[in-house]
Amino acid sequence: MSRHYEVVFLVHPDQSEQVPAMIERYKSLIEGGNGTIHRLEDWGRRQLAYPIQNLVKAHYVLLNIEVDQAVLSELVESFRFNDAVLRHLVIKRDGPDTEQSLIMKSKDEKGDKPERSERRRRDDEEGDAAPAATDTDGDNAEAA
């Protein structure tokens, strides 16, 4: 007996380039078990509400699917044994959700303004480079 589920999983940000392959693997698992995918959204890298494994960002993917329990169990087990998947959430739904999610609607309305994406990229680069330690005089601590 097939039921409707909403599945969200978070992927390690260093593995973002492998997300399309992961999605294809999960799609083939669902469709191979006579399941249906009603909605598939790749939300991209987003800020986490709290750090997970000392990470502040993760790659989000949303699926609305209709599968039976055996396929769902196999899908959840594949999430659990994949080290790149940081977290996953499965919610039982009453029916299929095919319309665009609120996150994707707001993303389309805002658009990704070039100056905003440039600022995000610059902030990411600055966050990766550790600033040099300074003493109270403003000189480098190593020079003292």
UniProtKB/Swiss-Prot annotation:
Residues 105-124 have a biased composition (Basic and acidic residues). Keywords: Ribonucleoprotein, Ribosomal protein, RNA-binding, rRNA-binding. The keyword Phosphoprotein does not apply. The keyword Ribosomal protein applies. GO terms for cellular component: cytosolic small ribosomal subunit. GO terms for biological process: translation. Residues 97-144 are annotated as: Disordered. Pfam families: Ribosomal_S6. Binds together with bS18 to 16S ribosomal RNA. NCBIfam families: S6. Belongs to the bacterial ribosomal protein bS6 family. PANTHER family: MITOCHONDRIAL 28S RIBOSOMAL PROTEIN S6, SMALL RIBOSOMAL SUBUNIT PROTEIN BS6M. This is Small ribosomal subunit protein bS6.
